Amino acid sequence: MKITNQELTKFSTIRTKSFAKYYCEPESISDLEEALAFNSTKNLSIVILGNGSNILFSKSFYENILFIRLTGDFNFFKINHDLVSIGASYSLKLAGRELIRIGCSDYIFFNLIPACIGGAVTQNAGTGIGEEIKDVCVSISCFDILKGKIVNLMNEECLFEYRNSIIKKKPNRYIVLSANFSIVNKVKDIKALVDKTKARISEKINREPSGYSFGSTFMNSSTPAWECIKSIRFRLNPSCGAFFSEKHNNWIINKNASGENIIALIKDTQKLVKEELNIDLINEVRII
């Protein structure tokens, strides 16, 4: 397994240009252990890359981080009775399609989120009440960097919260390898379930803006983030190469901005919302 320099631009859906000194794609546990052994000699931070739909590279070059993108053995989908085991690099949307095809009504929301399983678990991704990873995940398998071995965490041990988990809280401790999900709730009318899923997908596409974006910038609180941003957007700098979409005020669209430009836009927005509304906007996007 090679550890190389790598342009990171394609690994973030907002497409800010960035490069890494250290990057690797482990295809097996032994590859991952090799990467972690290398990391221990360099004392680098670790960042796991997935589909890139919730990440912002804030710098043009990284030399103190080992970027890891799991492939190979970590890309699988296996059904075993009332559980489905899915690898960390497997597409959440693809998993959703597979589960809908066999009548699993709890997994419509998988089809709406552009993430991989590992990233979705880390973020406790979801679309609303009753439609979060925590509601369907039974357990996860992860590599415990501190202990140097694979460990299994049950749902309650994952400490799932709104857009949070123990994995996110301890980024240099755990690496998600796979997750087990319950498939006990099945319906007989597959066509009706497929039609309902297609309708949800179409609705989501119609309400989301086009262009390079990482999706939601801030978490929602008692006042939706988009509503906060809408009230102060006229005071934001329109010439930085990125802007909040009028179609969805919590989405930043990138035209030609750098990571630094977008960070400045995020900070300015937080400052203005605090001044105007006395609300602290908390980042949902993962900033590296």
Give the positions of each predicted feature.
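A short, compositionally biased
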Residues: L70-F74, I133-S139
